């Protein structure tokens, strides 16, 4: 990946993380695009290079955070030596529950904003999830 692509990815990740922090702190409704770009230290135009609006950002953030969670669970499963399928299912379920217990903000954000349609749209189009 070139320097330009690295810079783009860094800016997008900065916007995503800043939005997540604000959405979980202030709430989605009380957070503005201006709040996000000001805290991220980026120009408003940069925001619109990556997202149509705050709702588009939220949808992509849901897919991104859910994808991260499942990717992390998959990596942990790969590292564990588990003999059968049922035990694997229990392991992944326990992993996700423990992660939600340790990261209340993530659970709150996903539970308030995740609808199957939003997740399917974001994952189905491959937006953001495949850009990791």
Task: List where the protein language model places each region.
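A short, Lys/Arg-enriched amphipathic alpha-helix from helix-turn-helix/homeodomain DNA-binding modules
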Residues: 12-21, 67, 71-74, 90
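Short hydrophobic/aromatic patch on the recognition helix
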Residues: 41-51
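Amphipathic alpha-helical segments used for helix-helix packing
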Residues: 98-121
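Basic, helix-initiating cap at the start of DNA-binding domains
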Residues: 1-26, 31-42, 56, 80
